[in-house]
Amino acid sequence: MKKMIAIVLALAMALALVACGGGATKMTMGTGGTAGTYYAYGGVLGQYITNNAEIEVVVVSTDGSKANIQSIDAGDYQLGTVQSDVLAYAWEGTRSFESEGKIDSFRVVAGLYAEAVQLITMDPEIKSVADLAGKSVSIGAPGSGVYFNAVDVLGAAGLTENDINAQYQSFADSTDALKDGKIDAAFIVAGAPTPAIQELCTTTNAYLVPIDRKSVV
């Protein structure tokens, strides 16, 4: 809690200095889908800044990290929540930014919280990542941070996209598809505990699948 307060205060003071220096008094913050952690967290953070730094922060729902970096580079947003590995992809021009090239016009203000790669299912046959073979699995939108995290975890278990029935869905679409029985499992990358996953595990027989340490290091 103390760390969170320190981060928020540092961000608020930094933006206040911008305002005092004759800079912008209104900023747009890109977050993520409305069902995810970015949007909820961004809403609280934006309101705090608005109340304490004399800068109005307008929080908007977006497609996530890559879209936020692109919008900051284009000048449409001034702030954005971004997955740290996607930030590195942009800076280096790799993976999700390989086709369009590097973007290095942004700067990091603060690290907010750790995100967890989570694998959720309602299929009792799925007890490990290896059990995803032949299953219908949401691995995030193409080129997204979730997508590359999922590909890395699958690879560590000896699987590729071709070994599963890959579905390229957003956070909200993934949880809805699980509820409706349209997919067998989904990769979710978000701050833990994740409210949408908690709700799903509480109201259905959904559960988190263990991911071996060797799959994430």
Residue ranges and their predicted role:
Residues 1-27:
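Short, low-complexity disordered leader/linker segments with a strong preference
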Residues 25-51, 56, 114-180:
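Bilobed "Venus flytrap"/periplasmic-binding protein-like clamshell domains
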Residues 78-83, 184-189, 207-209:
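Paired acidic/hydrophobic, glycine-rich loop segments that form the ligand-binding mouth/hinge
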Residues 24, 54, 64-67, 74-77, ...:
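Extracytoplasmic
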Residues 216:
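Conserved small/polar residues in nucleotide/adenosyl-binding loops
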Residues 43-47, 60-99, 119-122, 172-177, ...:
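Pocket-flanking alpha-helical
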Residues 20, 98-112:
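A structural signal for short loop-to-beta-strand junctions that line the ligand-binding cleft
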Residues 213:
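Conserved phosphate-handling catalytic cores of large alpha/beta enzymes
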